[in-house]
């Protein structure tokens, strides 16, 4: 039996958390989601990943605009944690300046998903991208228990 994929989710909007969970269900993905509502919580979790039994995610989904920081702050910390080097990191946001995107990519973001305004597009885009990233990660050794 395959173990559930683990997703590190930094998202302050509970409505978006629900939509992401629904997108994963629609893709028939069995996922364990570790949710962090602020950049500060996510940074602390990223520092702990792989240490003292703290789980290493298969994928990191990061809202860019968060209370107490942003996605780049989380990416910077994740980049310093060797256990997170091979983990795909996806920025999910409704708005991002070009220089912010460039900075996020330099810090290790794999790609950007723009949050659409309508529900069905979000379901399709987020679900498909997460499925793609998780499948790609299976072969790269990023998955760990």
Residue positions per predicted region:
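Conserved acidic segment of CheY-like receiver
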Residues: 5-16, 20-24
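Alpha4 helix (beta4-alpha4-beta5 surface) of REC/receiver domains from two-component response regulators
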Residues: 22, 73, 96-113
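Acidic, metal-coordinating helix/loop segments flanking the phosphotransfer/catalytic sites
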Residues: 35-59
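Acidic catalytic/metal-coordinating carboxylates
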Residues: 38, 70-73
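Active-site residues of response regulator receiver
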Residues: 62-63
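Short amphipathic alpha-helix used as the core "switch/output" element in two-component signaling
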Residues: 72-85
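Hydrophobic/aromatic residues positioned on beta-strands within the core alpha/beta folds
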Residues: 92-93
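C-terminal output helix
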Residues: 117-127
């Amino acid at each position: 039996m395959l173990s559930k994929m683990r997703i590190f989710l930094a998202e302050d909007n509970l409505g978006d958390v629900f939509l992401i969970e629904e997108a994963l269900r629609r893709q028939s993905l069995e996922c364990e989601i570790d949710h962090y509502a602020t950049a500060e919580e996510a940074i602390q979790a990223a520092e702990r990943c792989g240490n003292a039994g703290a789980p290493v995610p298969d994928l990191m989904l990061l809202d860019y605009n968060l209370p107490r920081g942003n996605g780049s702050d989380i990416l910077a910390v994740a980049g310093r944690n060797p256990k997170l080097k091979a983990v795909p990191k996806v920025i999910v946001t409704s708005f991002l300046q070009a220089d912010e995107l460039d900075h996020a990519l330099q810090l290790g973001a794999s790609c950007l998903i723009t949050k659409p305004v309508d529900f069905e597009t979000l379901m399709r885009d987020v679900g498909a991208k997460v499925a793609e990233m998780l499948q790609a990660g299976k072969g790269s050794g990023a998955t760990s228990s």
